[in-house]
From Swiss-Prot:
Localization per Swiss-Prot or TrEMBL: Cytoplasm; Cell membrane
GO molecular function: calcium-dependent phospholipid binding; metal ion binding
Residue sites binding Ca(2+) 3 per the record: 83, 86, 89
Binding site for Ca(2+) 1: 21, 30, 81, 83
Domain C2, first and last residues per copy: 1-112
Biological process according to GO: defense response
Cofactor binding summary note: Binds 3 Ca(2+) ions per C2 domain.
Protein name per UniProt: Elicitor-responsive protein 1
SMART domains: C2
Alphabetized PANTHER family for the sequence: 16 KDA PHLOEM PROTEIN 1 (PTHR46502:SF15), C2 DOMAIN-CONTAINING (PTHR46502)
Length: 159
C-alpha cells in the first residue's frame, strides 16, 4: 500500500470510565484523551466535571504517509484524568486498527468507519469503560492520480 492522505478522528464521548482519584469523590474525574497515530499526538479538551460519562465532540486530523509505514496501522486513544495539583492519572487505553480503513481509502479515494464503541482497558486488559469515535480516511489527490495512471485494479473497476 503506497500513498498518503488524512486520517480524521471524530472523538464523540466515553461511558462508564473508572478513575483513580483517592482524594476526591469517587467518580469525580476530569477526563481528556491523547489520540496518537505513530509519532503524531493530539490532545482533546478536558471534560471538566463530566465524570464517568464525558462528551467531547472534537475532530483531530493526522497526516498519513503509508509509503514510509509498513505493517499494521494503529490508532491509540489514551484516556487521562486531569489533576490540578498532581500528575494526571491514566484511566485506560483503546486501540483501533486502521489498516483496512487506510487501504480502502487509498483504493476508493475516501473511506469511513461509522461511529462505534471501543473498549477502554488497562495494561492487564481490565475493562475500564468505553469510548465512541468515528474515523474517515481521505487519500491525497496525488495518491489517487497515481492509481489512475497505473491503471490496474482501481482503474478497471470504474464504470
Amino acid at each position: 500500500m503506497a500513498g498518503s492522505g488524512v486520517l480524521e478522528v471524530h472523538l464523540v464521548d466515553a461511558k462508564g470510565l473508572t478513575g483513580n482519584d483517592f482524594l476526591g469523590e469517587i467518580g469525580k474525574i476530569d477526563p481528556y484523551v491523547v489520540v496518537q497515530y505513530r509519532s503524531q499526538e493530539r490532545k482533546s479538551s478536558v471534560a471538566r466535571d463530566q465524570g464517568k460519562n464525558p462528551s467531547w465532540n472534537e475532530v483531530f486530523k493526522f497526516q498519513i504517509n503509508s509509503t514510509a509505514a509498513t505493517g499494521q496501522h494503529k490508532l491509540f486513544l489514551r484516556l487521562m484524568d486531569h489533576d490540578t495539583f498532581s500528575r494526571d492519572d491514566f484511566l485506560g487505553e483503546a486501540t483501533i486498527n486502521v489498516t483496512d480503513l487506510i487501504s480502502l481509502g487509498m483504493e476508493h479515494g475516501t473511506w469511513e468507519m461509522s461511529e462505534s464503541k471501543h473498549r477502554v482497558v488497562l495494561a492487564d486488559k481490565t475493562y475500564h469503560g468505553e469510548i465512541r469515535v468515528s474515523l474517515t480516511f481521505t487519500a491525497s489527490a496525488k495518491a489517487q492520480d497515481h492509481a489512475e495512471q497505473v491503471g490496474g485494479w482501481a482503474h478497471s473497476f470504474r464504470q
